[in-house]
Amino acid sequence: MEPRPLLLLLGLCSAGLVLGSEHETRLVAKLFEDYNSVVRPVEDHRQAVEVTVGLQLIQLINVDEVNQIVTTNVRLKQQWVDYNLKWNPDDYGGVKKIHIPSEKIWRPDLVLYNNADGDFAIVKFTKVLLDYTGHITWTPPAIFKSYCEIIVTHFPFDEQNCSMKLGTWTYDGSVVVINPESDQPDLSNFMESGEWVIKESRGWKHWVFYACCPSTPYLDITYHFVMQRLPLYFIVNVIIPCLLFSFLTGLVFYLPTDSGEKMTLSISVLLSLTVFLLVIVELIPSTSSAVPLIGKYMLFTMVFVIASIIITVIVINTHHRSPSTHVMPEWVRKVFIDTIPNIMFFSTMKRPSREKQDKKIFTEDIDISDISGKPGPPPMGFHSPLIKHPEVKSAIEGIKYIAETMKSDQESNNAAEEWKYVAMVMDHILLAVFMLVCIIGTLAVFAGRLIELNQQG
């Protein structure tokens, strides 16, 4: 291609751009020649400006349970007609739409009524889209921090019902009428949160009459959001560890008392649980309005572990009892030795021997009455003259003392074995009871809420 045609083509394109820019320049100059951004854009002051409002939710940034603040990223779409900003496209080179700064035109002073950080107004003055009919579309972005009553009773399986109340700050319903663009906020560009999911959303228009001016309506549009928390993070990091601590607590009663490690395991579990609770305490909403489910479960786990320590002390004390310190009541023997083992099929547990020694010591057949000088019973059969000897008498007396001592020791050992057997039976019972309480307690805390959520779908 030769240089001259190329230069001619570039010149024509540049001329078109200049002409287009000149048309917009003339148009803007004409539109704002006598424009007053303070005056409502109506032909008759008795007319009301109709503003269509639409809320587009982009992101759920944060839910602050303690301060009860929900932070969201939104786009607030506002549409109205300004009769002062109309033109004929044929007079301006076919220009039908232009973008102008929002500061130059009249705008509805929409604010977030339930704002929680003191900044009620929308302060991001982006450009508006204006067409030749005077129709204006303004979609400024905003970060809303709205107040929301956070109910943590069912945390972390909770649902929150939060709202955003939008309305004009100075205009009543007789001069500015706001209408919702739709009965639902726009979620087409919503970025999913890792902690919350929006189950339901709706928008309502309200006519409010205040006591100061009962004949004048004030309009607002309120958007409600039902948000459900995703509990997986708390299940993995809080609930399952607490369940494992409870399971370890029950295993304390499976450990033999003779090993001497019962209290060591119990205290170790308690210390581990305490450190664990100190680490995860920041994950739980620190509010006194209600005790959340996860707080109840952590309290249950702590009481569960402490109760196991107290009962373990009682079991160890029972295991080490002796006849010199405790006499076994008959009801204890009947319940823990005779009854419960049969009911619970403790066939593998060796019971203590309760047989009394019926065999008589051979010295009972020997006449030792003359040791004290008193006549004994008449002799039966052969009576050896050796027992008359003093040394023999002394030996017999010593043997009898040893036999009685051995018999006493045997009775003491039998009594001690009975106490150990009672402690062993208690361990077996408590193992079953604690495991059952661990399962029932967990279900009692969470099952009701989980069933309710399942029914809601």
From Swiss-Prot:
Main subcellular location of this protein, as a coarse class: membrane
GO cellular component terms, A-Z: acetylcholine-gated channel complex; neuron projection; plasma membrane; postsynaptic membrane; synapse
Membrane topology (Extracellular): 21-230
Reaction catalysis annotation: K(+)(in) = K(+)(out); Na(+)(in) = Na(+)(out)
Keywords: Cell membrane, Disulfide bond, Glycoprotein, Ion channel, Ion transport, Ligand-gated ion channel, Membrane, Postsynaptic cell membrane, Receptor, Signal, Synapse, Transmembrane, Transmembrane helix, Transport
Residue intervals passing through the bilayer: 231-255, 263-281, 297-316, 429-447
Residues annotated as glycosylated: 161
Origin superkingdom: Eukaryota
Cysteine pairs bridged by disulfides in the record: 148-162, 212-213
Lipid bilayer topology: Multi-pass membrane protein
Secretion signal, residue range per the UniProt entry: 1-20
Function noted in UniProt: Upon acetylcholine binding, the AChR responds by an extensive change in conformation that affects all subunits and leads to opening of an ion-conducting channel across the plasma membrane.
Family, as annotated: Belongs to the ligand-gated ion channel (TC 1.A.9) family. Acetylcholine receptor (TC 1.A.9.1) subfamily. Alpha-1/CHRNA1 sub-subfamily.
Protein known as: Acetylcholine receptor subunit alpha
Organism, as annotated: Bos taurus
